[in-house]
Amino acid sequence: MRIIQHNLIKLFLACISVFINVHVNADASPDIWPYLKEQVFKDRVIQEDQNFLKIDGPKRASSGAQVPVTIALSENTHHIKKISVFIDANPGQHAATYFLTDQSQQILISTRIRMETDSYVRAVAETDSGELFMSAVPIRASGGCSGYMDV
């Protein structure tokens, strides 16, 4: 009887430790962005507190293979020439770049991205003068990059 209780306690503790490890590692980490920013933008300043650029996505995606993301540019008074999308924790972190014309005013870009694991998804907008603006959203998803992609 004592052996059964001892084994049940060990099993219970093992289950708790697995749950704690999975829960701790499941959140998107902001620690990746400084390294990615340094590689792509070097020492350029990126402004994060703006209202005209927004990226949005689900808090938890049902599939990492097709995560819906929307990028909204409410007004192009800053003369944005391109918007790049980055997924911090993906093997290939640069997901897309959209080039805008001078005629672009209110922009709404809806797309689907593949995500390997929980990550921040970032939209970085660059102006004609070289200023950078960013909006980011954490999204929980997994397994999208490991699946087959029919091209």
Give residue ranges: language-model regions.
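Transition segment at domain starts
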Residues: A26-S62, A96-Y98
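Short edge beta-strand/loop segments characteristic of extracellular beta-sandwich folds
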Residues: D56, P68-S74
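Extracellular Ig-like/FN3 beta-sandwich strand-entry sites
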Residues: G64, E116-Y120
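Beta-strand signatures of extracellular beta-sandwich domains
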Residues: K82-F86
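An anionic, turn-rich surface loop/hairpin at beta-sheet edges
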Residues: P91-R114
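Edge beta-strands of extracellular beta-sandwich domains
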Residues: F133-I139
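Low-complexity, Pro/Ser/Thr- and charge-rich linker/hinge segments at domain boundaries
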Residues: S142-V151
